[in-house]
Amino acid sequence: MSLALQIRSKDASETRKVSVDYTDKLESSETLTGSVTVAEQTTSDLTLTSPGVNSGSVTINGRTVAASASVSFTVAGGSAGKVYTVQVTVSTSNSQTFVDDLKLQVV
């Protein structure tokens, strides 16, 4: 398991799309496949919906990411002043499974 370096943030009243770039973890010609699982760790304050592998290219933090090299999901809720951990699990075409913890700060 790895911990994403960037802490994402959202306002408690917002519903936001979160995207995660896996380009640097994928081997040459490897892609993300199958279903994506997202789960909040420790509490149930957040509502996490619509997890999936992006079917087209997307831009994440100013970087163009190829189709099937990133995942996205929607997050709502949370209490202001708290930092949450969201675990993302996704499989690849080379039979790897990535499990990553993302930090989400609610302001």
Cite the ranges covered by each PLM segment.
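Predominantly extracytoplasmic/ectodomain segments of secreted and cell-surface proteins
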Residues: 1-31
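Low-complexity "stalk/linker" and mucin-like segments enriched in Ser/Thr/Pro/Ala/Gly
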Residues: 41-68
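Short strand-edge motifs at loop-to-beta-strand transitions and within beta-strands
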Residues: 69-73
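Surface-exposed, short loops/turns at beta-strand junctions within beta-sandwich domains
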Residues: 75-82
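Short, conserved beta-strand segments of beta-strand-rich sandwich/propeller modules, principally
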Residues: 83-87
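C-terminal edge beta-strand
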Residues: 96-107
